[in-house]
Swiss-Prot record:
Name of this chain's protein: ATP synthase subunit alpha
Matching NCBIfam families: atpA, PRK13343.1
Subunit structure: F-type ATPases have 2 components, CF(1) - the catalytic core - and CF(0) - the membrane proton channel. CF(1) has five subunits: alpha(3), beta(3), gamma(1), delta(1), epsilon(1). CF(0) has three main subunits: a(1), b(2) and c(9-12). The alpha and beta chains form an alternating ring which encloses part of the gamma chain. CF(1) is attached to CF(0) by a central stalk formed by the gamma and epsilon chains, while a peripheral stalk is formed by the delta and b chains.
Keywords, comma-separated and alphabetical: ATP synthesis, ATP-binding, Cell membrane, CF(1), Hydrogen ion transport, Ion transport, Membrane, Nucleotide-binding, Translocase, Transport
Enzyme class: translocase
A Pfam family matched in the record: ATP-synt_ab
Highest taxon of source: Bacteria
Length: 510
């Protein structure tokens, strides 16, 4: 059998035509120095700011400092397995997290990886953790209430969907409790909640998740946890990861609530990373861009225009103060960024006034626009009565005898303060809040002993639910107190006091 030269030529031609000379260019560098969760890498020539890089052992990092001859990388994982001389590859992408409905009910870390032992998250949608906030023309006014279920907040410091409301106070004053109650109260209201735990103990995060599960709130909640034992880099990116998950809901036309617990520890993590990277320190050793760290995060909360879906992302950042000092660096920064603050005081907390909200220093810059009309009708008088009470209470300490009008005002204030107390994990529907605040501001509690006010409230609301549910239904549906409804409330309240109300009997010891 002879091989003809023409056949050989034909085969060679086919081989040459089929050959594809594809060049794969990979941006590679080498670790020069590593330690304390950061690495200095030499040779990553075309790396982008905040680009993800991958180390030889599979651990990821973020290009944080871009210098002339090296790149400072923050390591998103265990840095103990990384050694000098290890290869580092640029991935060509910015840090992203999985987003979408599959995350609801799950506990994930700052990279969106599940840590609850319930298996993988089935989603093919990812979003970059850093994103420019919606512009002015993309937004619309905040005018829809986000009900927290907490009487003191919904009446005097209303929060709207798309607002940023700071919760600020010393440690152990009930900041997280307010946020958790708000999440529990969103059940059945079509709001997806994201709870971002930054720098907390793992046991504390587990306890929070257990509480949310006990009250059925995990069905509409995503928990993003970057605990105290996680690297500072993960604590730094955790809020941005949670925000990306919330933005997906907002841009899909849905409503999301995100709690950052807390931004003080977030600032500490960023300060730690920045100092290790040799960035110049400023006030309180924070880097110069610490304001931008929080402003670019909180500005992403918005209410979008209707033609963009009308979705909302509401932010409740938490900041811890030291010895009531709201003039420190981080508190003043976040106060200036947000649309109001809820200020919690240790003195009120230890006096048994819980939630320990100082309504004089707390404010919501959205105001009554985010309240239903019925709540606005009762809240105005409540605010005025409490303001007068605070003024007179300070004056009364120095007065030997009080005139009847002043004493009456102080007694009313004491009862209003008692009405605003509320146990933890018991958020109240807005129609019940309106009813009990109306009763208090219209003088029906003036002859009830202060220590019996809570029992009166319990019995009165039980009476409305069982005997007059139509009143609560009308408040909920009509969203205002019309004249005939007010008349009905007067009649029902008088009837309750005459025939139903039974004050607790004092125990007689023989």
């Amino acid at each position: 059998m002879s091989v003809r030269p023409t056949e050989i030529t034909e085969i060679l031609k086919q081989q040459i035509e089929q050959y594809g000379s594809r060049m794969v260019v990979t941006n590679v560098g080498y670790v020069v120095q590593v330690g304390d969760g950061i690495a200095t890498v030499h040779g990553l020539r075309d790396v982008m700011a905040s680009e993800l890089v991958e180390f030889e052992n599979g651990v990821l990092g973020i290009a944080f400092n871009l210098q002339e001859d090296s790149v400072g990388v923050i390591i998103l994982g265990d840095y103990t397995g990384i050694e000098e001389g290890d290869e580092v590859r640029a991935t060509g992408r910015i840090a992203s997290v999985p987003v979408g409905p599959a995350l609801v009910g799950r506990v994930v870390n700052a990279l969106g990886e599940p840590i609850d032992g319930k298996g993988p998250i089935n989603t093919d949608k990812f979003r970059p953790i850093e994103r420019i906030a919606p512009g002015v023309v993309m937004r619309q006014d905040v005018d829809t209430a986000l009900q927290t279920g907490i009487k003191a907040i919904d009446s005097m410091i209303p929060i709207g969907r798309g607002q940023r409301e700071l919760i600020i106070g010393d440690r152990q004053t009930g900041k997280t409790a307010i946020a958790i109650d708000t999440i529990i109260n969103q059940k059945g209201k079509g709001v997806i909640c994201i709870y971002v735990a930054i720098g907390q103990k793992r046991a504390q995060v587990a306890q929070t998740v257990a509480t949310l599960e006990r009250y059925g709130a995990m069905e509409h909640t995503i928990v993003v946890a970057a605990t105290a034992s996680d690297p500072a880099a993960l604590q730094y990116i955790a809020p941005y990861a949670g925000c990306a998950m919330g933005e997906e809901i907002m841009e899909s036309g849905g409503h999301a609530l995100i709690v950052y617990d807390d931004l003080s520890k977030h600032a500490w993590a960023y300060r730690q990373v920045s100092l290790l990277m040799r960035r110049p320190p400023g006030r309180e050793a924070y880097p110069g861009d610490i304001f931008y760290l929080h402003s670019r995060l909180l500005e992403r909360a918005a209410r979008l225009r209707d033609d963009l879906g009308g979705g909302t992302l509401t932010a409740l950042p938490i900041v811890e103060t030291q010895a009531n000092d709201v003039s420190a660096y981080i508190p003043t920064n976040v106060i200036s960024i947000t649309d109001g603050q809820i200020y919690l005081e240790p003195d009120l907390f230890y006096a048994g006034i819980r939630p320990a909200i100082n309504v004089g220093l707390s404010v919501s810059r959205v105001g009554g626009a985010a309240q239903i009309r019925a709540m606005r009708q009762v809240a105005g008088r409540l605010r005025l009565e409490l303001a007068q009470f605070r003024e007179l209470a300070a004056f009364a300490q120095f007065a030997a005898e009080l005139d009847p009008a002043t004493k009456r005002q102080i007694d009313r204030g004491l009862r209003l303060t008692e009405v605003l107390k509320q146990p933890q994990y018991e958020p109240m529907p807005v129609e019940e809040q309106v009813a009990i605040i109306w009763v208090a501001t219209n003088g029906y509690l003036d002859d009830v002993l202060v220590e019996h006010v809570r029992e009166f409230e319990k019995q009165y609301l039980d009476y409305l639910r069982t005997s007059h549910p139509q009143i609560l239904q009308r408040i909920a549906s009509e969203r205002e107190l019309k004249d005939d409804l007010i008349q009905q409330l007067h009649e029902v309240t008088r009837a309750f006091k005459q025939s139903i109300w039974a004050p607790p009997q004092e125990r007689v010891i023989i």
